[in-house]
From Swiss-Prot:
<dbReference type="Pfam" id="PF00253">
    <property type="entry name" value="Ribosomal_S14"/>
</dbReference>
<dbReference type="GO" id="GO:0006412">
    <property type="term" value="P:translation"/>
</dbReference>
<comment type="similarity">
    <text>Belongs to the universal ribosomal protein uS14 family.</text>
</comment>
<keyword id="KW-0150">Chloroplast</keyword>
<comment type="function">
    <text>Binds 16S rRNA, required for the assembly of 30S particles.</text>
</comment>
<protein>
    <recommendedName>
        <fullName>Small ribosomal subunit protein uS14c</fullName>
    </recommendedName>
</protein>
<keyword id="KW-0934">Plastid</keyword>
<keyword id="KW-0689">Ribosomal protein</keyword>
<dbReference type="InterPro" id="IPR001209">
    <property type="entry name" value="Ribosomal_uS14"/>
</dbReference>
<dbReference type="InterPro" id="IPR023036">
    <property type="entry name" value="Ribosomal_uS14_bac/plastid"/>
</dbReference>
<dbReference type="GO" id="GO:0003735">
    <property type="term" value="F:structural constituent of ribosome"/>
</dbReference>
<dbReference type="GO" id="GO:0009507">
    <property type="term" value="C:chloroplast"/>
</dbReference>
<dbReference type="GO" id="GO:0015935">
    <property type="term" value="C:small ribosomal subunit"/>
</dbReference>
<feature type="region of interest" description="Disordered">
    <location>
        <begin position="46"/>
        <end position="67"/>
    </location>
</feature>
<keyword id="KW-0687">Ribonucleoprotein</keyword>
<keyword id="KW-0694">RNA-binding</keyword>
<comment type="subunit">
    <text>Part of the 30S ribosomal subunit.</text>
</comment>
Length: 99
């Protein structure tokens, strides 16, 4: 189980990313069609925004354990929890393959 402080930190990053998403998106679109001087100004504005507002700072975490690695997007679970739940028949439509 991940520490609760790490999970809270990730939630704070998600909130910041949602708050600054439209601002960052509009600045990035403007920088594609702007002159060099305007691009420097836009770059400075992007740099002045909070670091944790960038979408690359987000991690997907397991919904049951909070583990940040080996996550399956379709289920929102880490690999070993997915395997345990599949063996316990808690995931509908998931069966162990045999051939």
């Amino acid at each position: 189980m991940a520490r609760k402080s790490l999970i809270q930190r990730e939630k704070k990053r998600q909130a910041l990313e949602r708050k600054y998403h439209l601002i960052r998106q509009s600045l990035e679109e403007k920088s594609k069609v702007s002159s060099l001087d305007d691009k420097w100004e836009i770059h400075r504005k992007l740099q002045s925004s909070p670091r944790n507002s960038a979408p690359t700072r987000l991690h997907r975490r397991c919904s049951s354990t909070g583990r940040p690695r080996a996550n399956y997007r379709d289920f929102g679970l880490s690999g070993h929890i997915l395997r345990e739940m599949a063996h316990a028949c808690l995931l509908p439509g998931i069966t162990k393959s045999s051939w």
